Each structure stands twice: as structure tokens, then as C-alpha cells.
Amino acid sequence: MSKTIKRIGSRRNEHRVLKGVIYVQASFNNTIVTATDVRGQVISWSSAGACGFKGTRRGTPFAAQTAAENVIRTLMDRGIGRVEVMISGPGRGRDTALRTIRRSGILLSFVRDVTPMPHNGCRPPKKRRV
């Protein structure tokens, strides 16, 4: 007789999450959107590159919007209704990603800009000559 083997990674005992944190990391070349629970466990992530955008199109606002929509879709499926948003970086997709999260219907607890600012740290790269 064969014994039944307990499945590893069974989704039956998955804990219910009601509140999450969305991190938007917007660089000049790409936008990465990560959704975690309040403990920091990653629920879902997406980036402009993972959505199929290549090269310079990854830094566009539309690519950031697509990445944010993918993460929000996963959060809605999990039943998460309230999120905190942490935005980091100087990229063009940061405002578009925030606008997409606002329009989605998920309640925002707060929005925080966590872009690291140097207190006159490293020397910046030289000016670009085109």
C-alpha cells in the first residue's frame, strides 16, 4: 500500500493578509513594483522589464503603469484592500505608478517618499555630452 505524501508548499494553510505595503522603485532605466505584507514577506512583484518592455522603453511611465497593474491584480485576488505605498528613486514612472494604485480602488493608508538623499556623499557622475 502506498502512503499519501503531504504536499510541500500547500496553499491551504496560507495565512490571510488584509493589509500590505507596495514599494515602487523608479530608476531612470526601469521601474520595479513589489508588494509585501506588513511583516515584509513578498506577495508579488513586477517590473517594466518583466512586463515585456525592452531597452529604453522600460523607463517610460506606461511601462511603470503596466508593472503596477500586474501587482495590483495579484493583491485584489488575495483580498488585500488596504496598502501603504513607499516610493523610491528619481525615475519617470513614480507618479504614474502611484496614480495607477490610487485608481485601482485599493485604500491607501499613506504614501511615503523614501528616496535616499546623500548628505554630500559620493561624487555624482560627470555631465553627459551628446
UniProtKB/Swiss-Prot annotation:
Example of a GO cellular component annotation carried by this entry: chloroplast
Pfam families referenced in this protein's UniProt entry, alphabetically: Ribosomal_S11
Localization, UniProt: Plastid, Chloroplast
One MF term in the entry's GO annotations: rRNA binding
Gene3D superfamilies xrefs: Ribosomal protein S11
Keywords per UniProt: Chloroplast, Plastid, Ribonucleoprotein, Ribosomal protein, RNA-binding, rRNA-binding
GO biological process, one term: translation
Protein family: Belongs to the universal ribosomal protein uS11 family.
Subunit structure comment from the entry: Part of the 30S ribosomal subunit.
Name of the protein in question: Small ribosomal subunit protein uS11c
Organism listed in the record: Pinus koraiensis (Korean pine)
